[in-house]
Amino acid sequence: MLSVAELTRGLSDLVEDRYDDVWVEGELSDFTRAASGHCYFSLKDEDAQIRCVMWKHLTQYVYFEPEEGMQVRVNGHASVYERRGDLQIQAQAMRQAGKGAQQKAFEELKQTLQAEGLFAPERKQALPAFPDTIGVVTSGQGAAIHDIQSGLARRFPPAEVVLCPVKVQGLDAPRAVADAVAAFNDLPADDAQRPDLLIVGRGGGSTEDLWAFNEEVVARALDASNLPVVSAVGHESDVTIADLVADERAATPSAAAERVVPDRRDVADRVRALHDRLRSRVTGRLQDARQRVDALVASRAFHAPARRLEQHRQHLDALVDRLGRGGARAVDRARTRLAHLRDRLHALDPEQPLRRGYVHLTQDGTSVQSAESLQDGDRVRLHFQDGRRDAEVLPDDG
């Protein structure tokens, strides 16, 4: 024989075990926001209805005003309210149902932000030409961070990547992305972790998967950023609110890596071209000075009587003195600039770290970025200055 409490408790356990995380779509009915801030409502269709409750701390993530009769999708877990024996859903998230409703929410937010000027070209920040540190806001486990790191290492090895791993889909994703952008901006200017720009994004997915980047909280965070932001959400055909607000949009995470840094080969070509241009300018100025002196010596004034000769000789001495000082300064400036360019080109040489005793670790031809990416027994290759050796990853003895 079971008591009523035992029966309802047993039913509650069965329901919670089977329906611990479900999405339910239905018509919103009897929506009430209590003085406590909790929301109570029902979901119904033609054949049934079920009561729902959403606690106050979760209601802040509902980015629309629920209305009677609205078609919605609710995520949560089913349970039995034991006092009355009622079946209910404890809701964790609510979305407007249907692509039409989702598109409507997108367009309404887009119009609001556009009216405020958040998409205006004059608000866009320019990207630095040679960033030293790049902040990345994305999942720490997805393909996006791998694509970004690989692209940066291939094009511009001196650039350092600082990752702030966040959820990129689900209820907590919009706030997590916004908080990460704000955290990067809050770093002191002298902090080595403070980046020169941000890449914010994720890999491809469905419209629902990418929806965090259509939320207003993310748009506001990108607009408030003092650091230039490049959005890299999904694939080329996906356009989100974040793409419209960001300073620049890249079609994919890989494209973002290519956009934010120059190719080291292009940098080397530019340094060589600048060297040649400076040398040509200095040579031209010296040649022009020689021609002016030769013309003066060949002129009639150079053969005039002694008094005029002395005057022109003094004038010539003054010209030669000015030319010497100016030419020396020009040569010194050119020499200093060439030394700076030579040092910059030297710093871009990927072999330099190896000459200082460092080792470059690869696996299947790809650079290894962290110990966590290796498993016991993995075969890796060690690149030294004077050769390379293969090795096997052994278990960590602690």
UniProtKB/Swiss-Prot annotation:
GO biological process: DNA catabolic process
Enzyme Commission number(s) from the entry: 3.1.11.6
Localization in the cell: Cytoplasm
Reaction(s) this enzyme catalyzes, per UniProt: Exonucleolytic cleavage in either 5'- to 3'- or 3'- to 5'-direction to yield nucleoside 5'-phosphates
EC category: hydrolase
Protein keywords: Cytoplasm, Exonuclease, Hydrolase, Nuclease
Disulfides per UniProt: none
Pfam families: Exonuc_VII_L, tRNA_anti_2
Record's GO cellular component terms: cytoplasm; exodeoxyribonuclease VII complex
GO molecular function, one term: exodeoxyribonuclease VII activity
InterPro entries per the UniProt record, alphabetical: Exonuc_VII_L, Exonuc_VII_lsu_C, OB-fold_nuc-bd_dom
UniProt key word Membrane: no
Family label: Belongs to the XseA family.
Main function: Bidirectionally degrades single-stranded DNA into large acid-insoluble oligonucleotides, which are then degraded further into small acid-soluble oligonucleotides.
Record note on quaternary structure: Heterooligomer composed of large and small subunits.
Protein name per the record: Exodeoxyribonuclease 7 large subunit
